[in-house]
């Protein structure tokens, strides 16, 4: 004769949910995580005396997905005020866009400068 052993596994989801007091005198409430928006960074283009205006418009259309009208408006702001904000992004995206613009400008032999600044 063989003795038969039976093992029963109980998982948390199998236990009946009870909202009753367990007698410990403690009330437990799950804390909701506090979420904050990530800090935002401005991507800024700076004016120089050598980069053609058409190239600046091309950069704004290519790397910031701006339409021709808005790209031209920002390019004119860069030209007249010395700098302009191209967009507001999280740090990683802002750094990537600035790096791409600077690399493309160097490859095209233009001194156009793009940097990021913390917003606020």
Swiss-Prot record:
GO biological process, one term: protein catabolic process
Organism of derivation: Pseudomonas putida (strain W619)
HAMAP family noted in UniProt: ClpS
Protein family (similarity comment): Belongs to the ClpS family.
Assembly mode: Binds to the N-terminal domain of the chaperone ClpA.
Gene3D superfamilies (UniProt xref): 3.30.1390.10
Top-level taxonomic group: Bacteria
Protein name: ATP-dependent Clp protease adapter protein ClpS
InterPro entries (UniProt xref): ClpS, ClpS_core, Ribosomal_bL12_C/ClpS-like
Span list, region Disordered: 1-25
Gene transcribed to yield this protein: clpS
Its biological purpose: Involved in the modulation of the specificity of the ClpAP-mediated ATP-dependent protein degradation.
């Amino acid at each position: 004769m063989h003795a038969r052993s039976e093992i029963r596994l109980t998982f948390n989801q199998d236990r009946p949910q009870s909202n009753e007091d367990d007698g410990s005198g403690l009330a437990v409430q799950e804390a909701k995580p506090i979420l904050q928006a990530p800090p935002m960074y401005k991507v800024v283009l700076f004016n120089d005396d050598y980069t053609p205006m058409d190239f600046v418009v091309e950069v704004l259309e290519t790397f910031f997905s701006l339409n021709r009208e808005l790209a031209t408006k920002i390019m004119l702001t860069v030209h007249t005020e010395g700098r302009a904000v191209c967009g507001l992004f999280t740090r990683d995206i802002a750094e990537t866009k600035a790096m791409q613009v600077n690399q493309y400008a160097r490859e095209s032999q233009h001194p156009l400068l793009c940097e990021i600044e913390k917003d606020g």
